[in-house]
From Swiss-Prot:
<comment type="subunit">
    <text>Probable component of the PAM complex at least composed of a mitochondrial HSP70 protein, Roe1, TIM44, blp/TIM16 and TIM14. Associates with the TIM23 complex.</text>
</comment>
<feature type="compositionally biased region" description="Basic and acidic residues">
    <location>
        <begin position="108"/>
        <end position="118"/>
    </location>
</feature>
<keyword id="KW-0496">Mitochondrion</keyword>
<protein>
    <recommendedName>
        <fullName>Mitochondrial import inner membrane translocase subunit Tim16</fullName>
    </recommendedName>
</protein>
<keyword id="KW-0653">Protein transport</keyword>
<dbReference type="GO" id="GO:0030150">
    <property type="term" value="P:protein import into mitochondrial matrix"/>
</dbReference>
<keyword id="KW-0217">Developmental protein</keyword>
<dbReference type="Pfam" id="PF03656">
    <property type="entry name" value="Pam16"/>
</dbReference>
<feature type="region of interest" description="Disordered">
    <location>
        <begin position="34"/>
        <end position="53"/>
    </location>
</feature>
<feature type="region of interest" description="J-like">
    <location>
        <begin position="60"/>
        <end position="113"/>
    </location>
</feature>
<feature type="region of interest" description="Disordered">
    <location>
        <begin position="108"/>
        <end position="141"/>
    </location>
</feature>
<keyword id="KW-0813">Transport</keyword>
<dbReference type="GO" id="GO:0005744">
    <property type="term" value="C:TIM23 mitochondrial import inner membrane translocase complex"/>
</dbReference>
<dbReference type="GO" id="GO:0002168">
    <property type="term" value="P:instar larval development"/>
</dbReference>
<keyword id="KW-0472">Membrane</keyword>
<dbReference type="InterPro" id="IPR005341">
    <property type="entry name" value="Tim16"/>
</dbReference>
<dbReference type="InterPro" id="IPR036869">
    <property type="entry name" value="J_dom_sf"/>
</dbReference>
Amino acid sequence: MAKYIAQIIVLGAQAVGRAFTKALRQEIAASQEAARRAGGGKQGDKSAESNLRTGMTLEEAKQILNIDDPKNVDAITKNYEHLFQVNERSKGGSFYIQSKVFRAKERLDHEIKAHEQPRSSNTEAAQDTAEESQSRSRQRR
């Protein structure tokens, strides 16, 4: 009798171990996929932060505002204003949809700002290195 109980315990532990291993592998794969989608590194961190702040991904925002190029500010503004006005509550629109439109524009604005900041920091870094090299050449003289 004890032999059968021991076998049941061993088989149960093996089944639980296999299930745990499979779940762990799936979690690792999902984590790697999420990191790949986010872009990884600092850019991925900024993208994830924007997603959390607005509660919406860049793809969702582009779909809501019917935008192909997230850098086209004129199209974003035009579509945002149209959709926001069409969904006014006083005109029988939906506050929920109106808030989604607002969040989509907010998410796209974050994306535009994120693309502008690295450019300005790159030019500042280039200026800093130029100034450093000039000061070094002056010190050598």
